[in-house]
């Protein structure tokens, strides 16, 4: 073989290798089923520069103008405090991914995401991921998307299962030192889909005395709930455990091949919305933080409730937190002085017609004690009281006697016919 032929063969081989490399780059999922990606794609460059200080200026280029309007309208005091907060989201699936997106759009300071699953095409009916992210870890794909949504948010991701011993210790450490100031974080949001992970979050938060919120959606996708959990003050997840947890059943044995839980993006969004709204109220101290909110999509029923801690809870840290909370309440000073606000007298400058407002909720002394007209009504006349001491006028007495005589006569005739 001549040198010229060898050069042509090498050239053709190089071209084939280059074409093969381009195909792998364009279609990374078309590799063998046993191969695993050795690296994650880099995060996309943010579309704008970071904003150092929030502004209430109403311009199209200000992504925070609508949020700062809450402060201008008196709903929230100092909305910019949200940039100081750190929230951990455990589970970035149907609820967790939407929660992370909402908090990112709200301008949260830092998000810490925990999940060990990968994005699948089957997830596209309910998650905010895109089909081209299939095969990537959920936390990495979420970070790439969220950074593009709001580059001001600091996002930390952990691609592991928190229920293993080593990973659980890391999870506890991030609760303890994961904030923007390397201190304790502000809140943990549980958005997982299994009881084992919920128990792990519950154990960690009881151990660290960390306030957290739990959420879930039913397997039939038409109901869900959120729950605010403050160790010692409210019931933890182990205080009122589900039947599967209380019975000690391995929930993995309950799953059947070929059978999956139903999933609706509407239910996921409703539960995520409730969870984020409760989170904002807690972090920014406005409104009322709900302890428990349920959701039934079939009847649009939203029950609210509060659950007290169980004094016989199996979690030793929960019992310790209950004791600490009881001591805290007992040591609080009792304020016996109750200030009664003075009623302000409304003064009208002009009252041309002499109109006066009266309280009609209680009957006046002039009204009958036996009859009550009700709120907003009054008698047209006062009913005459009839008793033994009532004196009748001559006309009334004559009428009374006449009616009595007729009655007596009818009775007498009836008796005669009976004989």
From Swiss-Prot:
- Catalytic positions are 260 (glycyl thioester intermediate)
Keyword tags:
ATP-binding, Metal-binding, Nucleotide-binding, Ubl conjugation pathway, Zinc
Q: Where does Zn(2+) bind?
A: 236, 239, 313, 318
Q: Where is the composition biased (Polar residues)?
A: 30-41
Cleavable signal peptide: none
State any single GO MF term. Answer: ubiquitin conjugating enzyme binding
Amino-acid positions noted as binding ATP in the UniProt annotation, renumbered to this chain: 94, 115, 138, 161, 194
Its tissue distribution reads:
Expressed in the intestine.
* Stretch list, region Disordered: 18-47
Q: Name one GO biological process term.
A: response to endoplasmic reticulum stress
Disulfide connectivity? none
Per the record, what phenotype accompanies loss of this gene's function?
A: Reduced egg laying and lifespan. Delayed larval development. Enhanced resistance to pathogens, heat and oxidative stress. Reduced survival in the presence of cadmium. Inactivation of the ufm-1 cascade.
Q: Give Gene Ontology CC terms.
A: cytoplasm; cytosol
Fill in the subunit field for this protein.
Interacts with ufc-1.
What function is annotated for this protein?
Answer: E1-like enzyme which activates ufm-1. Required for interaction between ufm-1 and ufc-1.
Report the family membership.
Answer: Belongs to the ubiquitin-activating E1 family. UBA5 subfamily.
State the protein's name.
Ubiquitin-like modifier-activating enzyme 5
Q: What organism, scientifically named, is this protein from?
A: Caenorhabditis elegans
């Amino acid at each position: 073989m001549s040198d010229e032929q060898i050069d042509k063969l090498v050239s053709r081989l190089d071209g084939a290798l280059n074409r093969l490399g381009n195909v792998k780059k364009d279609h990374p999922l078309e590799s063998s089923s046993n191969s695993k990606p050795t690296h994650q794609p880099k995060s996309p460059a943010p579309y704008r520069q970071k904003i150092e200080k929030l502004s209430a200026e109403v311009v199209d280029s200000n992504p925070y103008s609508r949020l700062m309007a809450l402060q201008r309208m008196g709903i929230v005091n100092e909305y910019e405090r949200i940039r100081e907060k750190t929230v951990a989201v455990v589970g970035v699936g149907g609820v967790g991914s939407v929660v992370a997106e909402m908090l990112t759009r709200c301008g949260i300071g830092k998000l810490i995401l925990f999940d060990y699953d990968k994005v699948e095409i089957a997830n596209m009916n309910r998650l905010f991921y895109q089909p081209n992210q299939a095969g990537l870890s959920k936390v990495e794909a979420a970070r790439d998307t969220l950074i593009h949504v709001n580059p001001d948010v600091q996002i930390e991701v952990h691609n592991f299962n928190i229920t293993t011993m080593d990973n659980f210790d890391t999870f506890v450490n991030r609760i303890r030192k994961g904030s923007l100031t390397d201190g304790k974080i502000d809140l943990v949001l549980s958005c997982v889909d299994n009881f084992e992970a919920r128990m792990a979050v519950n154990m960690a938060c009881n151990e660290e005395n960390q306030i957290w919120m739990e959420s879930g959606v039913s397997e039939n996708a038409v109901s869900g709930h959120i729950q605010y959990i403050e160790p010692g003050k409210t019931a933890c997840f182990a205080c009122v455990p589900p039947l599967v947890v209380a019975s000690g059943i391995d929930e993995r044995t309950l799953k059947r091949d070929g059978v999956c839980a139903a999933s609706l993006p509407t239910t996921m969004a409703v539960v995520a919305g409730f969870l984020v709204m409760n989170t904002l109220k807690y972090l920014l101290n406005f409104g009322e933080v709900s302890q428990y909110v349920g959701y039934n999509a079939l009847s649009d029923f939203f029950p609210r409730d509060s659950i007290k801690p169980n004094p016989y809870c199996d979690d030793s840290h929960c019992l310790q937190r209950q004791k600490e909370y009881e001591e805290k309440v007992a040591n609080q000073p009792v304020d016996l002085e109750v200030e009664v606000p003075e009623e302000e007298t409304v003064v009208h400058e002009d009252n041309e017609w002499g109109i006066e407002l009266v309280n009609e909720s209680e009957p006046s002394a002039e009204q009958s004690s036996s009859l009550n007209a009700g709120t907003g009504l009054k008698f047209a006349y006062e009913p005459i009281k009839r008793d033994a001491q009532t004196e009748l006028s001559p006309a009334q007495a004559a009428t009374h006697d006449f009616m009595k005589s007729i009655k007596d006569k009818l009775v007498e005739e009836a008796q005669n016919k009976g004989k």
